[in-house]
Amino acid sequence: RRRQRQMCIRDRISRGIYKNWQVWALDLKGNELVPRWKFDTADHSSKWLAMCSHCFRVADLDGDGRDEILYGSAAIDDNGSELWCSGNGHGDILHVGKFIKDRSGLQIVASFEESKDYEGQGNGYACQVIDARDGSMITGHGRNLPVDASDVGRCIVADVDPDSPDFEYWSSTQEGMFSCNGTGLVSTTYPSGIANGVMYN
């Protein structure tokens, strides 16, 4: 039996990420792409508006054996239905993986713009570690940032500390390197890179 192949394509038109956004699932039938489902924020409550990101990730967020789509502060189930919306607003970068050894499921590390504006529906932290299953915050830093520093455009997560079983993360807030498990500040010195990392042996 031929293996089914899946592909994700992202097209950002103008600056629509700050208002309405859509995600489509398409099947290749013969030589045609046929829509399977469409998630359009116009068909959902206003809390979904402006919750997407400059990138998305595909992973089994809820542990059901099927991949979901993570798009900023919003997660869409494999069938196109709502999984969760954390209410934390728009961000630039997302990382998904197993960052806390003894915690079930996957975790997300993400940074956000204008996080203070979303304290009412989110939690106001500019960089967060999030439970991928339900969008709840595990830990975070960068709350109550001054206006000129409120756009936290980058963060990174990596296993830097050999004495800890869990990963560490840091961001462009330049506040330090923190543990993903919520135990707090690990170090005030950390690598200068805040975009992507490569793990190797």
Q: Residue ranges of each PLM-predicted region?
A:
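A short beta-strand motif characteristic of beta-propeller blades
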Residues: 34-46, 81-86, 136-145, 184-189
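Calcium-coordinating acidic loop motifs
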Residues: 28, 60-62, 78, 99-100, ...
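Short, solvent-exposed loop/turn segments at conserved positions within beta-propeller repeat blades
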Residues: 16-20, 49-51, 87-89, 117-125, ...
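Short, small-residue-biased leader/transition segments that mark boundaries at the very start
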Residues: 2-9
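Repeat-based blade/solenoid architectures
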Residues: 1, 42-55, 87-96, 143-158, ...
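Structural motif
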Residues: 18-24, 77-79, 116-128, 175-181
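Residue-level signature of beta-propeller blades and closely related beta-rich strand-turn architectures
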Residues: 15-17, 75, 100, 112-114, ...
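Residues in Ca2+-coordinating acidic/glycine-rich loops
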Residues: 59-67, 101-104, 161-166, 182, ...
